[in-house]
């Protein structure tokens, strides 16, 4: 397994961070907090229901910064962004909680989830079951597993931990080898295809289109990175890909939710889906 250099650096720091967190709050206490957290909102179901109707199932990302682009949004208020996304028609939220490389925080996830009725995925680099239980404790409804960061044994262990605490799993792949490993190891219905090459950082929507034929029909494909305009959306939809994870394009907009609505819904007669809280 060839792990990109940037990812190696992130994972090394993540191992230190998990050890620090465990020293501050032991697993038993995190498990207690997880048991008392609000019930999960059904992340996978929210996406599947939209996709079955052939409607855009958008996971809208709340991300302050990235290692390659620096700060994406100076005026960064997670609750405000979450409400904007909900009004714009998002199906789910993705919130970055990695501190050192993405300027994220657990508090951002809590604030975003409290401000809306949408399910939330904790976007972080998961390498330890402790983080999975912690995700449930801070209110996440789903966790992300990045295949390029994990071996098959650990990937299966993390997915089993997620299931045990009621979390959905979004597995992320970048190429055919990772896809094969994910399908062999996990039974999650959510398969994310990241169109960004982690070695070169180049983005190509062809990555999703190339891998599509290898994915069983009972899995929902989520295309990640590189969706910038209506033509990109239509390219995916004509290939029957209806689930999208979009972050940077929204974060750079004055009104993230309005940009979401413009990109995915405006040419459909302005119908906004899921804008009314349950």
From Swiss-Prot:
GO terms for molecular function: indole-3-glycerol-phosphate synthase activity; phosphoribosylanthranilate isomerase activity. SUPFAM superfamilies: Ribulose-phoshate binding barrel. It catalyses: 1-(2-carboxyphenylamino)-1-deoxy-D-ribulose 5-phosphate + H(+) = (1S,2R)-1-C-(indol-3-yl)glycerol 3-phosphate + CO2 + H2O. InterPro entries: Aldolase_TIM, Indole-3-glycerol_P_synth, Indole-3-glycerol_P_synth_dom, Indole-3-GlycerolPSynthase_CS, RibuloseP-bd_barrel. Keywords: Amino-acid biosynthesis, Aromatic amino acid biosynthesis, Decarboxylase, Lyase, Tryptophan biosynthesis. Pathway: Amino-acid biosynthesis; L-tryptophan biosynthesis; L-tryptophan from chorismate: step 4/5. Signal peptide: none annotated. Its EC number is 4.1.1.48. Pfam families: IGPS. One of its GO terms (biological process) is L-tryptophan biosynthetic process. It is an enzyme of class 4 (lyase). The keyword Cell inner membrane does not apply. Belongs to the TrpC family. This is Indole-3-glycerol phosphate synthase. It comes from Pseudomonas aeruginosa (strain UCBPP-PA14). The lineage of its organism: Bacteria, Pseudomonadati, Pseudomonadota, Gammaproteobacteria, Pseudomonadales. The gene is trpC.
């Amino acid at each position: 397994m060839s792990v990109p250099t940037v990812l190696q650096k992130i994972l090394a720091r993540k191992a230190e961070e998990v050890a620090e967190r465990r020293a501050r709050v032991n697993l038993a206490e995190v498990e207690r907090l997880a048991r008392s957290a609000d019930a999960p909102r059904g992340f996978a179901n929210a996406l599947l229901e939209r996709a079955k109707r052939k409607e855009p199932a958008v996971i809208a990302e709340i991300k302050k910064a990235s290692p390659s682009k620096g700060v994406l949004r100076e005026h960064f208020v997670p609750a405000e962004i979450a409400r904007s996304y909900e009004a714009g028609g998002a199906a789910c939220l993705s919130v970055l909680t990695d501190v050192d490389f993405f300027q994220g925080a657990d508090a951002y996830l809590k604030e975003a989830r409290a401000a809306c009725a949408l399910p939330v995925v904790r976007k972080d680099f998961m390498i330890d079951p402790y983080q999975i239980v912690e995700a449930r404790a801070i209110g996440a409804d789903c966790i992300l597993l990045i295949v390029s960061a994990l071996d098959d044994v650990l990937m299966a262990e993390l997915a089993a931990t997620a299931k045990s605490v009621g979390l959905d799993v979004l597995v992320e792949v970048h190429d055919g080898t990772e896809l094969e490993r994910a399908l062999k190891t996990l039974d999650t219905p959510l398969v994310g295809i990241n169109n960004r090459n982690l070695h070169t950082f180049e983005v190509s929507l062809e990555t999703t289109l190339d891998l599509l034929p290898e994915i069983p029909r009972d899995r929902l494909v989520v295309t990640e990175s590189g969706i910038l305009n209506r033509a990109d959306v239509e390219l995916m939809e004509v290939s029957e890909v209806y689930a999208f994870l979009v972050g940077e394009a929204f974060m750079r907009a004055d009104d993230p939710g309005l940009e979401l609505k413009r990109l995915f819904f405006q040419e459909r007669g302005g119908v906004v889906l899921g804008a009314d809280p349950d």
